[in-house]
Amino acid sequence: GLTLTTEDFKILAQRPFDICIGAIAQYLIMPFLAFALTKALNLPDGIALGLILVGCCPGGVSSNIMSYLCGGDVAFSVGMTTVSTLLSPVMTPLMVSLLASGTHISIKGLPMFVSIIETVIFPVAVGFLLNYLLGKNKTFKELQKIMPGIAVLGLACVVGGVVSSQGSKFFESGVVIFVAVFLHNGLGYLLGYGAGKLTGMNT
């Protein structure tokens, strides 16, 4: 949110067709691919739900970084990240409820919707507003430079905490999780590229 500017929203008006195709692909390819892998690999309910949840989440900043490193269309990637994030309070609970209904884990859409608003949309909105109001402030610009590092450190702490608290279970299923995530990401890249190719995008 702190790096989001009004310029990032211009692509939505300039390339609405591409953005629509990207949003549709985001919430069709990754969720249904995750669902297919849970069935193909016969994953336990807990791991299956986790993979489906990942598949139903919006594209994050990492997609923008990968686009940059691979020489892709970074502006389009940022636009897609923005749209998929704005759609996530509705699409993520909806898709998870639909695809994870076969597990023995209770899925509650409304609490998930509220949680996404609180943890994703609200912080992004506050960051965008601060950037809009204070973007030219020297101190704020210095803060912007260090925030990505702080965010990565915070994420590492969260992941480390989860892994350490579930260490035995994680290592018991480590190979299965690795294979599932590798296939999900690899096939997601291929299918996403194919969707762009089929719709005439510059690939």
What is the predicted function of each stretch?
Residues 2-203:
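Alpha-helical transmembrane segments of multi-pass small-molecule/ion transporters
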